[in-house]
């Protein structure tokens, strides 16, 4: 299915609430209800959706995944768009939060099983990054592999320095030659921190 765009959220507070409402309904044959949902980075919606069939009382909980585009200031007036799918389609997006994955019932779909495994691997990687110690001013950071910079230098050891323009980020001063560097996504690199003596 393609993208569906609209000019309003039909009274809903935001994209997540709109999509929750779209996945919650009662029909003669089944009841559908969102048990838990999340809008990750304002671009992907994940939900644990419960289907209960009225004739058999069979209950299944599967993952709904929607790509989201939300721009309240869109020039053409189409402020919200989404593309929906479910886990059985094996979506590329695999950042589903663990609390949603924990609600899903077992499935036979190979694509869904692989997607769930990818989501759990990504969640473990996010936890590992979050638990990794952040460089603090005064420390020395030594990277396991040298980093290449646009000025042609390749360096692996820096002094961590407070950024005078931002209290949330730090700068890195080359230990041997001086000069300040910014290293984005520093936690994605393998390094060790050395405290000052």
Q: What are these language model-derived features?
A:
Residues 81-126, 173-197:
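Intrinsically disordered, low-complexity, charged/polar segments
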Residues 146-185:
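Basic/aromatic-rich interaction segments and small domains that mediate binding to polyanionic partners
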Residues 132-149:
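Short coil-to-beta transition motif at edge beta-strands of beta-rich domains
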Residues 19-35, 46, 53-55, 86-91, ...:
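A composition-biased, non-transmembrane "mature-region" signal
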Residues 2-42:
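Negatively charged, low-complexity tracts enriched in Asp/Glu with abundant Ser/Thr
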